[in-house]
């Protein structure tokens, strides 16, 4: 770790710190890519990991004899050195392991200590599902926060952010650390309080939008570290309107999804603009779009959600717009407007990309299967979809700030991540984020059995086959989880199961308020659960009594995802 980052970590308690954005050319990226593997071999990081964990094991007898107050004092004395990966790290790991055992009743495995050391070093850890990532993140957060560093634990949804913050709170409290969580719907004051805690659990989307709000509050020119430090000296801390304390240390769960799959997704902060009074314009755009012919007037690439007018389509559109004024008078205006209308009609589908409720169109996050409250599509697309669905038109939004996950997470002074599926994107993660991936061996060998893929002729046959397979597993005493890719698909399968008189529960964007209850029961013997991506990454399903003996949880996937991960 560079001297600059060490210095920044020392200042972390007082200033809104973040790493300056890097501007790299192709040659810079090539040099880093070519030298990354060599650097990793020279550092012999894996040997150091094994030595740290072995030394932590050797400390167990001494540490277990310590009183609670002695544990606390020992960690605070060792934390700063542990953050720098100094000789204090093994003792610090042993201290937190003992505290977790005393306060949570969970004694971290060697594999979890190994992963915690990987994260503390600012690397990507590939840790298999079921190995205890939640506790691992908490161990790392304890070590970093004990040195005064503001820690963000980034999870994939609100449910996990709140659950893990509350579940790990006794461990943090043992060391005098405070914890907060950020979920959708919190007020600015609630967010400010949560970010002021030693450790903050939050989702990637909530975190980035709060950062953008701070950027808008600071102003277009931003604020230098010296300016923010001056505010601190004057008693203003971060300033009255700022939410975060800076971007010091992040632990990103399911990091490949956030850092790679969603890397270039633009996150746009906007404010309400003028009300929409001319609904007839949107209806006319939809009417004209419906008269255009696929293939001859426009071409669609559904997999990439792309659509463009052909030369013939532009001519047809000009003919259909003849005699109309306003936006229809110019070729550029009418072509952009009708292209958006075509996207609304053919690329965005109800119960797949959005949900209609209470006279509003709610966007469904394609990665998590959850509703994104208050989010809208831009450039008139949202209003066109509202018009298509017969909803009242919302106001135009004016863009205030935007950023991608890739640009945002590169601004952390120290970034780390965990996932069970990092191997195939390890080179890209190293190139873009300078994160070297380390595979953490499982505590016990996996007992998962992968069955062959079955292909059916049509949807109806597929749903019947799913019902039959679920019935077979249920008869054996196993709980069954059926994964679907969309809200619509989950409800189609639910209808088939109901016709077959098979009791089941459905977890999708309509039933998101019942998530905790559904997940808690999904591992019980004889339970059948149909779920969208909401029960995907980061979801822990605990097996009920007798389930392991019956074969464990039986998972049925009904569609392949875009990525094998």
Can you name each region flagged by the protein language model?
Residues 1-565:
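Conserved P-loop NTPase motor core
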